Design a protein with these regions (language model features):
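Small-residue-mediated transmembrane helix hinge/kink sites in multi-pass secondary transporters
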Residues: 61, 86, 115-116
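Short, non-helical or kinked segments that cap or interrupt transmembrane helices
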Residues: 62-81, 120-126, 265-272, 291
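Phosphate/pyrophosphate-binding loop motifs in nucleotide- or prenyl diphosphate-using proteins
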Residues: 226
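Membrane-embedded alpha-helical core segments of multi-pass
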Residues: 51-59, 109-110
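Membrane-water interface segments at transmembrane-helix boundaries in multipass membrane proteins
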Residues: 1-52, 82-102, 135-223, 231-247, ...
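C-terminal ends of transmembrane helices
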Residues: 3-6, 59-65
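Alpha-helical transmembrane segments within multi-pass membrane transporters and channels
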Residues: 93-135, 296-298
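Conserved kink/hinge residues within transmembrane alpha-helices of Major Facilitator Superfamily
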Residues: 57, 111-112, 256, 294
Length: 359
């Protein structure tokens, strides 16, 4: 049967083509942003914030967009990564480059721990359990005062250096500016942090795109569409779900470690349900399963919050109204089609004259 004009599958090719056209231009702009005329500390810091949410969105996109597992407690892994880095750096003196993978591994471990109890849950029940998990982590870091300093948070978290070269204004030979013969500037650290989170975000994107075309990625998409059919086909649902939770949590842990080193201070108030809702909104607005859509949504949402900062209490109303309008006009998100990464070719009818004996 012919597909209707409004069928989302008819839009898959144009949207994919648009995404392929936008992505290189967006990447090129991102790469040169710190060196564009008129760009200063505020713009670079805003870029860092946007890229942090892009990375978080891509991490959650694995769980929600590809595997179809509604996770309302993703901020828990963000918190685990942040506190893991802070505690390792403060208590053991480990460098950022050592703590970063450890924070990701620890967050992935908690992702697996969350995954086991919810293996048989779907939809609303899964959402409730993940929401509770996110709140449990926040309550634990709030009340475990001897370890996390409770609601007062952890301060004095070490900032990363450029492979042993600190970003100091002294200009000494053993500093970043002195080693490269540059005039000391506070912008150097911001530019370094900008490219650091950009590299982490691109790593997240590269791993996700590679996995989507692997058997594991196809299993995620198949499970998203029909879990019962997946079981009938012999797909190991347990492994498929746990890997989605673990990988999504790992990237959330990386982002959390970066957040801790960027802020040099963390507290439980930074990891509330509002953060989970914001990240989920980015994934839904961009289009579940769409990498470029999530990036555009993060830019629109975080940039929009800054744009309407002067509206104070009204900006949430503007944000909510805009979200409703976009969801009415684009129910599948800005660049969302939910088409599989690898699909069978289009079926064609065969003329009856070509079917016969000897042909």
């Amino acid at each position: 049967a012919a597909r209707g004009a409004g069928d989302p599958h008819r839009l898959a090719a144009p949207l994919a083509a648009a995404g392929r056209a936008i992505a290189p231009a967006l990447l090129a702009l991102t790469l040169v942003l710190p060196f564009l005329p008129g760009v200063g500390r505020y713009e670079i810091d805003l870029g860092i914030l946007v890229l942090t949410y892009v990375m978080l969105g891509w991490g959650l996109n694995i769980v929600v967009g590809l595997a179809g597992l509604l996770d309302l407690g993703y901020v828990a892994f963000y918190a685990v990564g942040a506190y893991a880095y802070a505690l390792l750096a403060l208590n053991f003196g480990l460098s950022f480059w050592v703590c970063l993978p450890l924070a990701g591994i620890l967050a992935a471990f908690w992702g697996v721990l969350l995954g086991f109890p919810v293996l048989r849950l779907r939809g609303d029940y899964l959402a409730i359990v993940t929401l509770a998990f996110g709140e449990i982590i926040r309550i634990v870091v709030t009340n475990w005062v001897s370890l996390t300093n409770g609601p007062n948070g952890l301060s004095g978290i070490p900032r990363p250096s450029f492979f042993g070269l600190p970003f100091s204004m002294s200009g000494e030979p053993d500093t970043f500016a002195g080693y490269f013969g540059l005039t000391p500037s506070p912008l150097h650290r911001f530019i370094f942090l900008y490219y650091l989170i950009l590299a982490l975000a691109l790593l997240t994107n590269w791993v996700t795109l590679r996995l989507r075309r692997q058997p594991l990625g196809r299993a995620w998409e198949a499970m998203r569409e029909d879990e019962v059919a997946c079981r009938a086909l012999g797909i190991n649902i347990t492994v498929t779900k746990l890997t989605a939770f673990a990988l999504g949590a790992m990237f959330g842990g990386f982002a959390g470690a970066f957040f801790a080193t960027r802020q040099a201070f963390i507290s439980p108030e930074s990891f509330t349900f509002i953060e989970s809702a914001m990240i989920l909104a980015i994934v839904v607005l961009g289009g579940m399963g769409s990498q470029i859509g999530v990036a555009i949504a993060a830019l629109v949402m975080i940039g929009g919050f800054e744009l309407f900062r002067d509206l104070a209490e009204w900006r949430m109303l503007v944000f909510g109204g805009t979200m409703v309008l976009i969801m009415v006009l684009r129910p599948r998100g800005l660049v969302g089609t939910r088409t599989p990464s690898i699909a069978l070719g289009r079926r064609r009818t065969i003329d009856a004259s070509l079917v016969g004996e000897g042909r």
